[in-house]
Amino acid sequence: MPVHDASSLAAALSRTSFMDVFQRLDHAVLESLWSEGDARSALEAMVGNPAASPDTRFLAAEILFAKVPGYPPPDAVENLAAIYADALRNAPKAMANPWGMPGMQDGQIAQHVLLLGEAAIPALRAQLDDARSVTFSGSKEATFGNSYHYRIKDIAAELIARIRNLPFIPDIDPAGRDGAIRKLAMTLK
């Protein structure tokens, strides 16, 4: 999949997925997307373009995190916070593994949100009422993660607590987590 300019890179991103680029053992897709032309500038432009599709912006950001040491620059953090909040809103459409399991492990995407720091909190705050379920795949991780019935708001709460260095220990019961999430939300007002 050689890519020669910004428009063909955008088209290539629209035809692929996070799983294709980051979760296959063969990283040929990532390398192909990165190797042709001025991929960095094109990807940065996509991240900053509100007219680009949310999925394209998110995938462009993930590639930049993977390929550019020290990414993101300070002037991109607020924009990235909105992109990642949108990705979390869309998490039920995909497997949740890259977000990690609250209280247990950070996934690749969660690590990137944590790097955004305080700028991510307003966008994540809006997710604390989203009770849609997320699904984990695999064997051990899926069995454990899905038994907890994690939701978008659980992941958002975990990320906010980590950014603010606040306690958040996910209860096995969603109703118990709801109480902890309400307490966390009160600290954000």
What are these regions (language model features)?
Residues 1-189:
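Extended repeat-based scaffolds of very large eukaryotic assembly and lipid-transport proteins
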